[in-house]
Every structure is written in C-alpha cells, then in structure tokens.
Amino acid sequence: MDRDNGPRVRVPEQRTPSIPATADALRFTVLGPVRAWRGSELLSSGSPQQRALLTALLLREGRTATAGELIDAFWGEDPPSQALATIRTYASRLRKILGQDTLVSESGGYAIRTERSALDLTLAQDLAAEAEKARAAGDRCQARTLINKVLGLWDGEALASVPGPYADNQRTRLEEWRLQLTETRLDLDLEVGCHAEAVSELTALTAAHPLRERLRELLMVALYRSGRQAEALAVYADTRRLLAEELGVDPRPELAELQQRILRADEELARPADEPAPAPAPLKPAQLPATVPDFTGRSAFVTELGSRLATAEGSVMAVSAVAGIGGVGKTTLAVHVAHQARRHFPDGQLYVDLQGAGARAAEPETVLGSFLRALGTADSAIPDTLDERAALYRSTLDGRRILILLDNAHDAAQIRPLLPGTPGCAALVTSRVRMVDLAGAHLVDLDVMSPEEALQLFTRIVGAERVGAEREAALDVVAACGFLPLAIRIAASRLAARRTWTVSVLAAKLADERRRLDELQAGDLTVKATFELGYGQLEPAQAHAFRLLGLADGPDISLAAAAALLDLDPHVAEDLLEALVDTSLVESAAPGRYRYHDLVRLYARACAERDEQPPVRRELALSRLLDFYLATAAGVYALERPGERVLDHFTPTEYPGLTFPAREAALDWLFTESSGLLACARQSAAIGMPQRAADLLMAVVDLGESGANSHQFATAAKAVSEAAKAAGVPRAEARARTMLSHVHSVSGRFAEAEAEAMRALDLGRLAQDAVSQGQAPNQRGIIALYENRHDDAEAHLTQALTAFRADGNKPGEAAALCNLSRVHLATGRTATAVRLAEEGVAIYDSDASGLALIGSGRTDPARHVLLEALQIFRESRQQLWHGMTLFRLSELHLTEQEGAQAAAHAEQSLVVLRGIGGDWRRANVLTVLGRALTVIGQTDRAQVCWGEALTVFEELGSPEAEAVRQLLDPAGVG
C-alpha cells in the first residue's frame, strides 16, 4: 500500500527530476510535504499554521488572496477573535524566510510572486497537458513517459500534515487528480502492451477504490489480455454485486459491453503483444555484514524490529528507521535483526553504508548502480539518471522478497529513491537523524543501554573473572561511559588488551571528565570522532546553540531556560533545539525539556572552549541563565511569602524570568526545575557569580525542606559558601551559610547548623547584610530551642526579632514571634506563648499557635489550627513542616488520651519525615509514638519505638535520652 493514501503507484520511469535549481532560485513543492528551497537548501517553513498560509498562497498561483479568504482557509466558519492578527504574524514570519519580493502585500491581502516553473504543481499541470497533446497525436509512448513524470512529482500525500479546511479540500482534489492520472497511465500501459505488468497494480487499486468502475474496466482488460479470461469475468461479477449492494445500481454500459466482448473472446480486444525473451534467473545478493559475536541486550528493540520486518510478507512494504546518537549501536542492532530476519527474505539482502554522517554522503544514483549490478543488471543496461535508475530498481525488485539495509543515512531525501516500490520487500534504515519526513516509516529511537546491559557487554569483552572481582569499579566504568555501547566497547577493549591493569585503574582514568573523551579511544575507534561527525553536519546557529547549551550543569533544561541562556526568542530557540533533537545530539526528555548524554555534554563543552571565544561569551550565557532562574524563583518566593523583604535585598537581574498566575503553578515550576536550579547555583558561584548564586539559594529555600532535594540543597549551599569565601564576598558567604545552617537544622545536625549560623551572623555584620542579620540569629534560636537551651534561644530570637523589625520584614518578624512563643511555652509561660503566637502572620503561625494552645489546655482551637497548617504544608510540598505538624497533632491527641489517633498521626509523621528532618526529629516522633501505643495497650511495640529513640539520642548526645531511659524502665511503662 502507498505510505500515505491507497496503493503505491508503480511508475516504471519515475521519478522526474525536481524543479531545476539555480544558486538562489526559490522552489516549492505541494505534491507531498509543503516545502520551500532556495537553490539546494531546504528552508524552514515554520509551524503547521505557517505551512497552511504558504499552501493557500501557492495554490492561487500568483493571485492575491484577501485576508477574508485566508481566514476562511484557516478556520472556516469559526475563526478566532484575533484571526487577522494571527494571519499577519504568520505572513511576517514567512516573509523573513522567503524574502520581501516573493511574499508581497497588496489590496488588503497577500500573494507569492515567483516563476511558474518554481512550483511542482504547475510543472505537473504543464507536463500533463503535453501528455494529452502527445496522446492526441498518436504518440502513446511519449504520452506515457510524460504521465510517468507527472506522477513522479508526487512524494506521498499532497499537502501532507497541512491543517485547515482549505487544505483538506485541496488535498482531496489533488488526490483525485492523481488517481485520474494513474488511470490514464494504466490505460496507456495497456495500449503499449504492458498488460501483464499492470495486473498487480490494478488489483491493489481496485481493492483500495472498489466503487471506481474505470479501474475495474482496466483490470478486466489487463486480465483478458494476459490470458486470464475467467478472472476478468469474475471482476465484472464482483463489480455488479458490489454496485447493487452498495448503491442499488447496475454497472455502466461500457463495463457491460466489455463483459460481452470478453465472453465472445473478442480478438480485437485481446490485441496480443510480442512476448519478451525469457529473462535470466535473478541473482540472490547476500550483502549483510557479519553480526558482532558479543551482541548484548536490546531484546525489546530486536522484537519490535523483527516483527515489523515479518509484516513485509503481507500487503504493506515495511520500512523501519532506527535513529540515535553516534555510538549508540544502531548499525550493530540493525545487522543483528537483519540476520535474524533473513528467512523472511529468500531472494536476498542488500546493504550499503550511506556515509550520512560524513562530509560527503553517498549519492543515491551511485548506490542504485551498485544495487542493480548486485541484482544481475548488466552495466550496459543501467541508465544514467537517478530517476531512470530508481524506476529500473523498483521494477527489478517487483515480485521479489529482498531486505534492504540502508545504514548511516543522511536524511530522508537520500533514502527515498532506494526504497522498494511494492510489498514483499522491506527496508531497514539507520541514521543519526530522526526520519520524521519519511512517510510511512516506523520510527525507532535507540537510547543508551540499561546499566545491566552495559555491564553485560563490558563483561563479555573483558571477562567474567576480572569483572566479578571488581564489580563496583566496573559499574563506575560503564557509568563513566554514559552506558553508550561504543564507549563501553572501547573502554573494555583497552582493558582486555592490558592484563596488568585492574578495572579500578581504568575507572580512575575515566573519572577525570576533562580527559574522559581522550581516554575513550582504541585504535581507529574513538567516541570523540563519532560526535565530531554529527557536529560537523550542523548549521552555524545550531552549532552555536549546541555549544552553549552544553555549558549548563543541570541534568536537563526547559525551553524557557534554554532561550534565556541562548538569548533568543523561545520560538527561535525551540526550532534550534528540535533540530538538535532530530540529529540525536540532544535528547527531548519530555515536551519542552532537553538534555545531553553525559559524553555529548563533555564534547559540547570542549567545542565551546575552542569556539566560543573570548571566554566572556560563555560566562555571559551562564549569567543569563542565572538571571532567568533567579528572577523566576524570586517570583515563586513572593507568591509563597507575600510581604517578605528578603527579595528587596537580592542583586538586580538583567534578564527577566517567568511569571505565574497562581501559587500552584509556581510550585510546580520550582520542584520541576529543582536539580537545574541547584546546579546553576553551584556552577555560578564557581565561575565568579557568588552573590546571585547565594540569592538563588535563598529564593529556592523550599527545596531544602522538600526531602527529595535537601541533600542537593546542602551540597549547593556548601559549594556557594566556599566559592564566596574564596572570592572575598562576605554578604554572599553569609547568606549561603545561613541556608546551610537551615538545611543542617532541618536534618537534625544541630552542631553543624549552629557553627554555620554563628559564622553567617559574623559575616552578615561585617557586610551589613540585613538578610543574614535577621535569619542567622533566628536559626540559632531554633537550634537552641531544640537543644533545650531556652535562655540562649530567647536571646537569639529576640535579636532576630529586632533585626527583622529594623528591616521592616513582617513575615520574618512573625516567624521570630512564633519561635519565641515556643520558648515561652517550653519554660511554662503559656499565656505569653499564646499571645506571641497569635501575633504571627506568616505561614508558620498555624503550627506555633497550635503548639501554644496545646500547652495552655485549649485543645479544640489547637486542633483546628494544626489541621489548617497541615493542609497548607501538604499543598505547598513542605515535607518537613508537614511531618512536624503531624507530630504536633499526635501530641495533641495524646494529651486527650486518644491513643489510636495519636499513634496514627505519629506513624504518618515518620513516613513523611523519612529521609529528611534528621535522626533527632525521628527519635522525638518515636518517643511520642511509644507513648501513644501504651495508651492502646501495645506495650511491646512501645518498647521497640523507645529503644530506637534511645539509640539515636545517645548517639547525638541529646538530653532527651534520660527521659526515654525512664520510659523503658518497666515501672515506667503504661
């Protein structure tokens, strides 16, 4: 079947050369995907909507299309309110591509001014008119040749993937014309005696268009002239039955008359043609390269591709295109699958390396010449032109079952002439480029190996004994190779050839990122050379984007962040990124997100160091990314903490960030971008931007409390503080150390938290930084409160309160008041505790008020306040405070002797705090859980909880240990 619509039309003399191109001439095609060329360069026609506009103008053949006509073409009877503005936008973008003289504005509309021969449709119309003249003059062979050229201009379905009602109508019209031309060509085939060859094509066409009587008439003639009178009559009977059942009509008179002539064995109708001489038995090529003996893994891909090749036995010609980064094992996989599928292709297998990743890809006509010779065609019988060779190639393959492996393809244009024209054969294509424009192809994206597959491949080359002795080092090696098969094979081959090396020696060599690509070479195998082939194919703008994007340390990057780094409009950035994805140099992790393979990132950075000079160009790119992240994160912070003065003290940014309509969307962005944000903070500080890096940490402080990100946050805060210290920027160091103190405190590492807070306060005073002078003593007060140093806690928190008030920081003031409330509660001053807590206005006031109300015996309002806090923390993904509020609720239920509820909340708290909050908090929750369990009579479980809590408190040297020892005393149980 045709890859787009209906059966593939067999045209023995396809396909006609494309429209003649001069160096700068514009050319357009609509008989397939809508495209534009300038000379031999394919131009980007933009979005589907832009292609729809281009289509509407091209099909008017130079006539002006009014705005109203274009709006109708795009949207029909239901245009949007901004339809005219949208049309103008698309027209402006197209004009930039095509030029001011080509896309012109006049009389309130638009037109494309170009030569008639520049459009494939008008060329097809002119050729069809010449064919009619030739036929009328009795030159059937010339008419047939011209019609073949017309049909050869089609490249799949006309106006492929162009949206809009106008395009739909025109697509239907053009497909009808194509079918009429096919009928004309088949009629000419019969007139020149090619009836036997026409039968299979007519059979497929009538199956696809069962009610088209002209096709059935031609099929009856072809069968009759091929000596198949009974089958010809059966076609008529089937036609009569079908028309009666479907439409309630009889066949047209011409068809009935044809049946009578066949019944009479009309000799004039038979018109026997000269029988050609018997052809020699065709050769059976077997060109597949040998499969690698250590082929490993890829079972899902082997099954998927194998099943696709097996379908070639049916009515559809199977084409599968495997794409992936250089070195990922595309050829190895394809050759392995092809060998397994040989039994499905008894007439042979063809293979060619198309050298698509090199500077000079193989020319299709050269490949066709080689294929034709392999299929038994004499040199003297091989035509000169691409179209003639392709036509002969398809004719030679017709009726045979041959597998064609097209390895290392450059693009779909190189592939199309090499594809079979009829079912039975199959093609397997490999390329670094995703063949999205190869209509009908089954696309397979080949990724790197899984860690298990990678280790298996490494083991098969190196040997099980050596790998088994150093399994962890072997895992380090394959991870350093990024699980890329070529890199693993090179590393393993080097190790296998050096018996004195251990696996650990190789792992150590690969640990140095700056040397890693140089280490990954063995003989003529090298990872760097593989990447260089792909890089060399990029356009200058694509190569520039490839280099700069590789500079960012994050595991992936969003489109918006990439646009900031590249200093481009997001639409332009997206086009570049998607082009890089199509070349497999960049991966699309998810819609709108992009990432590099680890080794490709190293290569991109090496290219950037070489080509992005002076170094300030690289620094400016990372500075834009930092500005984007900081500006956006500051907006999230403002939504989370309205009125917070911290943002007023941030370093101004030059590049804007995103804005969010609601808090939920802002938090989604924050947690989605978490790894990139923290990586940017580390990287920016290391290259001389510690102040903005420290500000970024403060803006994303929620990540330090989220559990999944707390370790990354601590690592980033430490890196920023050290970089700020080395650079002599005390304000940045103070803020980074404040954040480091915070995350240490959240994790229960109070000694480290106290040390960082003390240093932060000293630095804040030195730098006269209002932010750290408020937050550092507040942090010290919290630590002292946890350690039951109530006098110190009150002093530090009072100092923080003074600093926050001096700065006009109301949320900070509220936090300090809430924390002071807890100090007063712990020292028995419950009335003051309630008063202080009720003054709190920040998000933490619910938890603090609840704690104070519990201490004063007012449990009902405490329950309400804590449940409100629980909802807030759960929705904002603040896992630490979510877990601690569950802990407070457990304490509340315990005061009411509600043991079951207390135990349930304590157990939930342990689940939420798993991995965050530190051992100290976990031990406190275990202590309360033990108390709750005794209330409901589960004393054995209570003993276990207290035993775990005691171990933690003793390891931390916490004073709570003594209270737990008393609980563990049998006299204290119950």
Swiss-Prot record:
What the protein does comes down to: Component of the AfsK/AfsR system involved in the response of aerial mycelium formation to glucose.
Family per record: Belongs to the AfsR/DnrI/RedD regulatory family.
The signal peptide, as residue positions, is: none
The alphabetical list of record keywords is: Activator, Antibiotic biosynthesis, ATP-binding, DNA-binding, Nucleotide-binding, Phosphoprotein, Pigment, Repeat, TPR repeat, Transcription, Transcription regulation, Two-component regulatory system
Post-translational modification here is noted as: Phosphorylated on serines and threonines by AfsK.
Tell me what this protein is called. Regulatory protein AfsR
Q: Which InterPro entries match?
A: AfsR-DnrI-RedD_regulator, BTAD, NB-ARC, OmpR/PhoB-type_DNA-bd, P-loop_NTPase, Sig_transdc_resp-reg_C-effctor, TPR-like_helical_dom_sf, TPR_rpt
GO process terms (BP): antibiotic biosynthetic process; phosphorelay signal transduction system; regulation of DNA-templated transcription
User: What Pfam families has UniProt attached to this entry?
Assistant: BTAD, NB-ARC, TPR_12, Trans_reg_C
Would the keyword DNA-binding turn up in this protein's UniProt record?
yes
Segments forming domain NB-ARC: 274-591
